[in-house]
A protein has these predicted regions:
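Gly/Ser/Thr-rich beta-alpha loop segments that engage phosphate groups in nucleotides
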Residues: 7, 15, 65-66, 118-119
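Short beta-strand segments
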Residues: 21, 40, 59-62, 79, ...
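Metal-dependent enolase-superfamily TIM-barrel catalytic cores that perform enediolate-based chemistry
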Residues: 67-191
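Metal- or metallocofactor-binding catalytic centers and their adjacent structured scaffolds
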Residues: 1-34, 89
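Short glycine- and Lys/Arg-enriched binding-loop motifs that mark or flank ligand-binding interfaces
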Residues: 9-15, 59-60, 112-113
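Beta-strand segments within the central parallel beta-sheet cores of soluble alpha/beta enzyme folds
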Residues: 1, 35-59, 146-150
Length: 191
């Protein structure tokens, strides 16, 4: 990480850093003949019983650099809640298909962005949240109980000269306005 030398790791980039980190971890695991997950637990001294499986986040609407649709948020995600992974995957699939039908019904394009989520031309970022909430309900699930929302804001992508260009490339927002917007969303949506 120190090789990059920048505060936000922009010189090497997250993809390169992640790839090298994973390669080093795999090499370490292979050298001691352990599965990767056991090696990582050993290196970080994680007790066998003291761990949680990662939460499954599914990217279902793309914006930012992943889609040419005017949305500044890079990834709108759903996080299905269930004990079994296969059920979380099934729930996500149902919601994804419900969103496809909803977008089509409302006249939005159903093409996908670089990350596999839909890339509709929406009026604003919040409209993406509203459509996902609607799709969750259409699929028969309860937002905030069965399914939660996640966002990859990727704010560094629209930050220039001390301001955020969140809603438009011409209107600058101070950090305080961004924070207030996200606070309102957290109250309004199960993020």
């Amino acid at each position: 990480l120190s090789l990059d030398g920048t505060k936000n790791k922009s010189k090497l980039g997250a993809n390169a850093i992640l790839a090298v980190s994973l390669a080093v971890a795999r090499a370490g695991a292979m050298s001691v003949k352990l599965p990767l997950y056991k090696y990582i637990r050993q290196v970080y001294r994680i007790d066998e019983k003291n761990y949680r499986m990662p939460v499954l986040g599914m990217n279902i609407i793309n914006g930012g650099r992943h889609a040419d649709n005017g949305l500044s948020i890079q990834e709108f995600m759903i996080l299905p809640k269930h004990k079994l992974l296969r059920e979380r995957v099934r729930m996500g699939s149902q919601i994804f298909h419900a969103l496809a039908g909803l977008l089509s019904q409302k006249g939005y394009a159903t093409g996908v962005g670089d990350e596999g989520g839909f890339a509709p031309e929406l009026l604003n970022n919040e409209r993406g949240l509203q459509l996902i909430m609607e799709a969750i309900k259409l699929a028969g699930w309860e937002p905030g109980k069965d399914v939660f929302l996640g966002l990859d804001i990727a704010a560094s992508e629209f930050y220039r000269h001390g301001s955020y260009y969140f809603m438009s490339k011409k209107q600058a927002w101070p950090a305080s306005r961004m924070i207030e917007t996200f606070k309102q969303w957290v109250k309004k949506y199960p993020i």
